[in-house]
Amino acid sequence: MKKFITLVLMLLAACVLVGCNNGSTGSKTGDIAETNYTVETVENLNAQAPGSVVVSFRIPFGTKIENQIRDFADEFQALYPSVTIELEVVSGYDEMKSATIQDIGGGKVPTMTVGYPDHFAEYLISKSIISLDKFIKDPNVGYTTEELADFLPGYITENRQFDKNGTYVGLPFNKSTEALYYNVEFFEEFNLEVPTTWDEMETVCAQIMTIVAGLEDDQYSWLGKIKTNLANGEFIPCLYDSGGNFFTTIIHQFGGEYTKSIYKSNGLVDVQRGTLCFNTSNEAYEAFEYLQGLSKKGYISMPDALELTYGSYAYNVGKAIMNIGSTGGSGYYADAICTTGVAPLPYKTEEHKNVIQQGTNVCIMSQASDLEKLAAWLFIKYMLQPEKTAEFAMTTGYMPVRQSAYELQDYIDWLAGPTNEAKVHNGTAKYASEGWQYFVDAAWAGSSTVRNECETAMIQIIVNQTDINQALQDAVGRIG
């Protein structure tokens, strides 16, 4: 178990921020985020009337994560009686970003929120996020050098990508990656090896199609109505949940380029525009050509091919033997008719073993009062304690964001348990032991549109068998 923990930390320390300067050095060139605030004192916060300092926390999460945050809020409010934590739950990440942008333009902005780097880029246009550097460096409420170093380096890098000074615009909150979920009984019954490369995936999928062609409905309880599904064109050996992740991951795995950040002369990232690379990258074309070939053979596709939102729906009833999806979504496999195994997703070559780092970060909005900012900061610190980020991981399946959290006995004991979440954490340990690198792509306002249009292009290429160049150029045209 200690070996697993060491491997995870090694991997996260090697996170690659693609197309961006990692921003840890350089002379002062301007402020990317709002710095015009004063770090209030805890004494003044505690002197306020009970519940009078209201911190609104906007989140897009489902019930499981929401309930865990509510538990944290209850604990925090017991420590700071003058503070009230109000959760504002918005249904969906995009809806949350849209609501926040609208509020920045004239509504009631939350005190704090979570978001992806491209969300933060949009908020930074108007400096609606504060720089956390004042809080981090404050001798009374900040982090020591040792505490700050306890955060996983890759997660910190993502939050410091917007200028050459490495300004903190947020801290990591809920983090995940992707994994290959597979039908254990099928692989064991027919003596198949779980694929580690895309070439092996092609071979295994061919074997699967040969095997299932001779099977009857309900011949195996862990395969379901296989003959009917085949006859209806509703069986695919492997599905990939996220078209956006599929698009960018395969480009990186083939050594291509997706996007790049643009640095202005003052050392700040241009948060309103970036450079598209996927449409001119020969390696990107090669990647899509290869995957389209697998799709034409009926080996791999996306949930859209079955008119589904997630591949886990098909996997759970035997319409797929493998599904590539988020490690944060392991709970969706709980109702599968088979035993679910977890492994790293396939890669192209040893030189490009890339896997995406995903999940949100947490920030404080500049419109809040100084007392509200302090209360929000203290709440963030509370939730990101090693014990709390480990508790969050064990409850939700997301990864701890502090290195010392991986060494806590409660977390170590949990890893040895039978839950799907623990299985995922153990199953993806090879990401650290076998030379994988997490990547995070460049972010700017509108880069989420790039991702969305590239997901559409991926559906066209994989599901609809559209001409690759046409699909890519159409995506560029839609992006504008």
What is each stretch, according to the model?
Residues 30-47, 97, 118-177, 217-230, ...:
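Hinge/lid segment of periplasmic solute-binding proteins
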Residues 58, 419-479:
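C-terminal capping/gating helix-and-loop segments adjacent to ligand/active sites or protein-protein/ligand interfaces
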Residues 75-154, 185-196, 314, 322, ...:
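Extracytoplasmic "Venus flytrap"/periplasmic binding protein-like
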Residues 78, 84-86, 189-190, 297-300, ...:
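Extracytoplasmic/periplasmic substrate-recognition and gating elements
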